[in-house]
Amino acid sequence: MKTFALALGGGGARGLAHIPVTEALDDLGVKPAAIAGTSIGALVGAAYAAGMRGKDIRRHVIALAHNRGEITRRLIAARAGTLADLFTGAFGQATQLDAEKFCAQFLPEAVPQDFAALQIPLTVIATDLHRRQEAVFTSGPLRPALAGSIAIPGLFRPVAIGSGILVDGGATNPLPFDQVRERAGVTIAVDVFGMPELERNDIPSVWESMFTTLQIMGSAIAAAKHKHAPADLMIRPNVTIFRMLDFYQASAILRAADAVKAEVKEKLGALLAA
């Protein structure tokens, strides 16, 4: 049987749709030879590479999503600054999140501190802000790399690793199937950007406008890459109706994405057996 590599893209809360894909792999009884992830895809990828089963990742997410008080407590603990910063001119510090603290608060305990402790090789994608290029992490401290990968400008404070200042990996490689193409015989990519919403004509909030713009940019980058050198299997869960920060709707997102399980099992199974 052929080997396969798995690429999980960014997309905020829509990225919870990666979880049913991992459950489908568990149902098939197969594991990827390598995983690459950007932003939320890096977080799910890290949990899966650490040895968690898809159903256990789902259980962790739902337990948090159904406890708003606990989410609020953890978000407060993950702030980059304090309320006092509002009155000392450091407004951004008070309103932004610290991505490393966020990972410490929300990642499952099974996710280790170092890449070396993972059961499956993992590639994490971030963006080096000042060098204006993709930053690729495959070894060393894991959680700082994950923090850099999720550091959406405006929401998170940029993350410093070595001489690099990192922001969200979606700015340079939102769906990193190219990073694992040579690692296996088959490459599967999971696109959670969503489809155009032709029936909408409402004026979105400031945050939604910004995040949707990032999604459009990411989708365009991924589409261009796929046209140039496509992944062997592209999976697109139907999660368009959800917004980037709809984490409280985790159960609904997972239900909507469950439909891809059959597609993954049928199409990937055929590719691996060919």
What are these regions, as identified by a protein language model?
Residues 1-38, 46-274:
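Patatin-like phospholipase
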